[in-house]
């Protein structure tokens, strides 16, 4: 895959990846209000996960701005996914988290393949690309960080999301 193809894939996937944490956090929040009981800190954690996925998206948007057709595809996908995931979460939160865990496993594989291609010299534009100030600040990267370092940080986030969702 080329840099442009990876960017399209990452942008599309990250627009969907932010949904589960937000839906799960909202449903758990409403349940906590309804039952008048603590949630054990999961609401905050799930909302942070959604925010982290949004940061991933914003990171990739620094390199490419999608066109109207792509944005419409995202809108349609989000409408379907929000509805479907909400229903699944209400029916079985355990199944919903397991599903997200598997999606995160696929994300880890995708980022791993991208990093491998970058290391093999198949993505020459990204090999010389510096990390942006925003990514350096967000992930605490060194000032001389490259795009590869950003991809490693994003992959590490996805690994954490995978583990948390398999735990839940």
In which residue ranges do the predicted regions lie?
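Non-heme di-metal
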Residues: 1-168
